[in-house]
Amino acid sequence: MSTYIPIHDRPPHYANLPSPPSNSRQPRPPRYSSPDIDPDIPLARMSSAHESDPSEQANATQSGDYVPRQRVGSQGAEQEGQSRKRARTSPSHSGGNGSYVPRQRTEESHHSHHNGHSGHAQSDQHGNGQVYRPRHGQAPLTGSIFNLSPRNPFTSVVGDFIMNAAMGHSNVEIELKLGTFMTPSMPGQQPRRINMPTLSEMIIPHDYPNGPFVSTINHLHHRTLNELLNRAVESQSTHPTGRLYFSRSKLADSFYDHSEHGHGKVRVSRDMDNGHVVQAVEKRRIADLNVYCPGMAYDFRISVNTETPCEVPTGNAKSVRYKDRACYRHQVCRVDLTSVFSSNPRNADVPPSRSFELEIEVLDVPALLAEGAAQSERFDEILQNVLDSARMLVKNI
């Protein structure tokens, strides 16, 4: 009867297996490196005697078995030639933080970019060596897997805002003004522009605690936009449709505290050349929708107001604004680029000021509201036209 041996004292189960002969011709299986190590440089074998025997490697190669390449020092590296992998960039060459350094473009790809074509479509090659070329005659896309395109969510919010704000009102005016939204500031603090956590334009919630909206633009930006719009008028002079029409007006707007009904301010516009009254309206603000545009020079505010015709009030005006306005009328909207000189007749101690403004006004508001009530696609098309006009102006500053 054999003596009992505790399990922790027993030898491993493979201890009695026969050992392979020492003169075996079979090479050791290849050892693969981790992704962080160059696979062209294999790890060192455990048996240096086996690696140092060139006859065994030659026999193994003749037998069809894989033998990884061996490099011995710098001499082996020179014989093997340059590695097929791109060399990693050291921290000293990448700004000190090991960041990615892009490859240099070849002359061909650089030339293709100057020709207005993508370098990928002209010079990039697939693994099989074929050059990618764009296909011609492809079928148009259908919008989605359901062959329908959803309503633009931004335009949808703007449309719902306008329809809800204008409900029950007549003589509605819809305008969009460029400006800057400022943070709330205490007395003595320097106001600054708000900074929202977004990378694209964003509709600011109505209950967000932002500060005032400065509805003026820089005088250099005013000049840039004036030149841009003038060039657009000249370039579109022969277009059968979609032309931009230019006109100019010089008006003196006098503002009074309120009308007989006391609902809003009264504005009386007079022609600066002859002093004739052009318009007298009672303006009342209904609602505003604020849009923040990160990375752009200005934000914009969409306002719904009412302008009700009224009689010219008596008495002295509270303030007077002299407006030199360049008007650019398009299909559904008009861009008003205005240089304003303001004064306060009631207080001579307040010095006059000069400012510059840009606003976009919807031309046919009743037609827009009718399209919105009918829930037609034309409603979104008009709004998209107005919004895109504002975006194009802001992007070209």
Swiss-Prot record:
GO terms for molecular function: mRNA 5'-triphosphate monophosphatase activity; polynucleotide 5'-phosphatase activity. One of its GO terms (biological process) is 7-methylguanosine mRNA capping. Residues 1-149 are annotated as: Disordered. It holds the Pfam family mRNA_triPase. Keywords: Hydrolase, mRNA capping, mRNA processing, Nucleus. It catalyses: a 5'-end triphospho-ribonucleoside in mRNA + H2O = a 5'-end diphospho-ribonucleoside in mRNA + phosphate + H(+). This is mRNA-capping enzyme subunit beta. It comes from Cryptococcus neoformans var. neoformans serotype D (strain JEC21 / ATCC MYA-565).
